[in-house]
Curated annotation (Swiss-Prot):
Superkingdom to which the source organism belongs: Bacteria
Reported function: Key component of the proton channel; it plays a direct role in the translocation of protons across the membrane.
GO cellular component terms attached to this protein's record: plasma membrane; proton-transporting ATP synthase complex
GO MF, any single term: proton-transporting ATP synthase activity, rotational mechanism
Subcellular location: Cell membrane
Organism: Mycobacterium leprae (strain TN)
Main subcellular localisation: membrane
InterPro entries: ATP_syn_F0_a_bact/chloroplast (IPR045082), ATP_synth_F0_asu (IPR000568), ATP_synth_F0_asu_AS (IPR023011), F0_ATP_A_sf (IPR035908)
Protein name, per record: ATP synthase subunit a
């Protein structure tokens, strides 16, 4: 009998490096990726602020982010109106940049081998951790409901959410509203997590051919990370639009 070994490695999916802070279990790899992404966003904001205030020729990075800001502004103008909700623009752009950088960190070829001989990414995508995406989605959930209360009133907003466009569908509208942060987070988590699974499977290829599919997928991963960041920010704008909609109001 001939035995064929298809894989001598071990596939580890969804594993995180954990530690205990103040009695709570913390995924340190997610915290590290999130902190680095936040630091890059803040540094990028100060850099672009300096460029905007200067009188020199705009650099390529400035033009790139200006194009993103214009795109977000157009979406907000058509969905809500900049005069009604100007605060949504910096929020949407910040969320886009933050998620984009978080996703792109995993593309960096930084790996190490642990004591068990398993090769692990130093900077994994924070969006591959369900805690990260749920926290981000619930933050958006709270923000657009606060905006809805500011726009419609503390009584008018809950009534409008339950009533929706068809009053007798109030129970369904309530379930839909509760599931919004779940669907928003799982959409991002599923795509990024699936990418991590594929990279893990590619790592099982023989070393002499592994570089080719890995390079192709890493390139595609840049595109997927950008698309998912854009979708998350666009849905954020859409949820703000729904929460701040007022009947028979003309701007």
């Amino acid at each position: 009998m001939t035995e064929t070994i298809l894989s001598g490695g071990q596939i580890e999916v969804g594993e995180h490096h954990t530690t205990t802070w103040f009695g709570m279990t913390v995924n340190t790899d997610t915290v590290l990726s999130t902190a680095i992404a936040a630091a890059i966003v803040i540094a990028l904001a100060f850099f672009l602020r300096t460029k905007v205030n200067s009188t020199g020729v705009p650099c390529g990075m400035q033009l790139f982010w200006e194009a993103i800001t214009v795109q977000m502004r157009t979406q907000i103008e058509s969905a809500i109106g900049m005069r009604i909700a100007p605060f949504v623009l910096p929020l949407a752009v910040t969320i886009f940049v933050f998620i984009l950088i978080s996703n792109w960190l995993s593309v960096l070829p930084l790996q190490y081998t642990n004591a068990d001989g398993h090769t692990t990414e130093v900077l994994s995508s924070a969006a591959a951790d369900i805690n990260y995406v749920l926290a981000l989605a619930f933050f958006v959930f709270v923000c657009y409901h606060l905006a809805g209360i500011w726009r419609r009133g503390i009584v008018g907003h809950p009534v409008a959410v339950l009533k929706g466009h068809v009053a007798f569908l109030a129970p369904i509208n309530l379930v839909e509203e509760i599931t919004k942060p779940i669907s928003l987070s799982l959409r991002l988590f599923g795509n990024i997590f699936a990418g991590g699974i594929l990279v893990t499977l590619i790592a099982l290829f023989p070393p002499y051919i592994m570089w080719a599919p890995n390079a192709i997928w890493k390139s595609f991963d840049l595109f997927v990370g950008a698309i998912q960041a854009f979708i998350f920010s666009i849905l954020t704008i859409l949820y703000f639009s729904q929460a701040m909609e007022v009947e028979d109001h003309h701007d």
